[in-house]
């Protein structure tokens, strides 16, 4: 798991489950948490920690998948809803992470095209406030 990919068990209803499914957050890219670039790693680990706090192990969340689409590595693409205690409302976690500068919008374009936005985000995200 990292800031834009999680492993989940999906309840399909009627006692049917899809276990240990890897879900790629749709429409977002976060900095890598497994990299030799220590600056990028710091922000990647912050995004990962934010996701772990928003989707704790054993919790139940709403996942909306993107119909008939998978990511580059065959992962299911999805959007999560998580509860934001500050606004006392359920929010689209994917968009919330972009708003908090933990990730950038991503729809399959090359990583080079979004690298600059990741660097800009480093100056905008408040790691202490997470």
Q: Where would I find each of the regions flagged by the language model?
A:
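Small beta-barrel nucleic-acid-binding modules, primarily SNase/OB-fold domains
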Residues: 1-130
């Amino acid at each position: 798991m990292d800031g834009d990919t999680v492993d989940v068990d999906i309840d399909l209803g009627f006692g049917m489950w899809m276990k240990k499914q890897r879900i790629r957050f749709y429409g977002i890219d976060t900095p890598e948490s497994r990299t030799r670039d220590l600056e990028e790693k710091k922000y990647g680990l912050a995004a990962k920690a934010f996701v772990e706090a928003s989707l704790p192990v054993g919790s139940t969340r709403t996942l909306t998948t993107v119909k008939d689409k998978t990511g580059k590595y065959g992962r299911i693409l999805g959007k999560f809803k998580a509860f934001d205690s500050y606004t006392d409302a359920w929010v689209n976690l994917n968009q919330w992470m972009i708003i908090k500068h933990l990730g950038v919008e991503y729809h399959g374009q090359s990583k080079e095209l979004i690298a600059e936005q990741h660097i800009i985000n480093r100056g905008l995200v408040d790691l202490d406030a997470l």
